């Protein structure tokens, strides 16, 4: 690849591809003028697996295990959007208990995602200690996931019309205990981090995005709300049962890396509030829509039938996707996660277009780092919160 230098004193540095445990396999081609960043070009595609094309050759249920590999730190959200798309297309109603279970799982996943954003973000700046505290709390969330779904990651828990299984006995009490334990820990993080003068020097006023720029670039999630835009799809689209609990949109008006940090810290507090309310008022009833399952039952099996004897697990509903198109979106930890689904009277989608929040949010990175110091690239990149699995797809 030929690259022309505008100034003979400029230097080109290739940052990355980074290790998957940090910001994913992202490569940055940085043009430096001394220690100042003259230009920056993100290079994508190292984790491209053809997720959209795979979806066109699978039924929705067959495709569910794949979607947890998009954003592998917030897999509940990728599962939710995958089942929401055919639910909206076929107008399938969700039982109230299933909707509450989904909200509980989504908010736990949001906290886990923000925690694993905060740890590497602080490590990028040079603070290693918070990383270990954060992993301690995140481990408790994964224990809750394992008890409810059987898996710590890649849960495969959501189903068309509800969820795979009901919450086990005693799980709600354990989750409430976690909320009581975790809520003061957020204040402990703030005391440890926000009052650190070195941290403030590294993030305050760094990576500024104005309100107009955030809207024009199509940013979403904490990137948008940190620039003074009160936009949260949980309030805007009124999906699941978020209207039945009391919570507030977290936003800041400064638009810098510190504001994006404060928004995510505030969102963890609001997620705990949502969890505590949902766990206390969760209704009884079914955890799945039985009508959705009946769509798949072609015949009543007899006791001695071969198929009946060897059916180890109840079948999941697979039905034809009507010849329609629909866009569905949810508020993921990183922003607006959307699916544009086109049906063609087949069990396979004709088109499955993924709208990943990280891909759109990453586009503003060259503008943010231009004119900054080389050392400012990592705090700015960390404040965006990207996962290459959903960016490259």
UniProtKB/Swiss-Prot annotation:
Quaternary structure note: NDH is composed of at least 16 different subunits, 5 of which are encoded in the nucleus.
| Disulfide bridge map | none
Q: What is this protein called?
A: NAD(P)H-quinone oxidoreductase subunit H, chloroplastic
Q: Which Gene3D superfamilies match?
A: Cytochrome-c3 Hydrogenase, chain B
Name its cellular compartments: Plastid, Chloroplast thylakoid membrane
For this protein, the record's Pfam families field holds:
Complex1_49kDa
* Keyword Plastid among record annotations: yes
Q: What does the UniProt keyword field contain?
A: Chloroplast, Membrane, NAD, NADP, Plastid, Plastoquinone, Quinone, Thylakoid, Translocase, Transport
Q: Which PANTHER family match?
A: NADH DEHYDROGENASE [UBIQUINONE] IRON-SULFUR PROTEIN 2, MITOCHONDRIAL, NADH-UBIQUINONE OXIDOREDUCTASE 49 KDA SUBUNIT
Which reaction does this chain catalyze?
Answer: a plastoquinone + NADH + (n+1) H(+)(in) = a plastoquinol + NAD(+) + n H(+)(out); a plastoquinone + NADPH + (n+1) H(+)(in) = a plastoquinol + NADP(+) + n H(+)(out)
Classify the protein's membrane topology as the record does: Peripheral membrane protein
Purpose = NDH shuttles electrons from NAD(P)H:plastoquinone, via FMN and iron-sulfur (Fe-S) centers, to quinones in the photosynthetic chain and possibly in a chloroplast respiratory chain. The immediate electron acceptor for the enzyme in this species is believed to be plastoquinone. Couples the redox reaction to proton translocation, and thus conserves the redox energy in a proton gradient.
- What InterPro entries would the database entry show? NADH_Q_OxRdtase_suD, NADH_UbQ_OxRdtase_49kDa_CS, NDH1_su_D/H, NiFe-Hase_large
Q: Highest taxon of the source? A: Eukaryota
Q: What does the similarity note say?
A: Belongs to the complex I 49 kDa subunit family.
GO molecular-function terms, A-Z: NAD binding; oxidoreductase activity, acting on NAD(P)H, quinone or similar compound as acceptor; quinone binding
Task: Write the Enzyme Commission number(s) for this entry.
Answer: 7.1.1.-
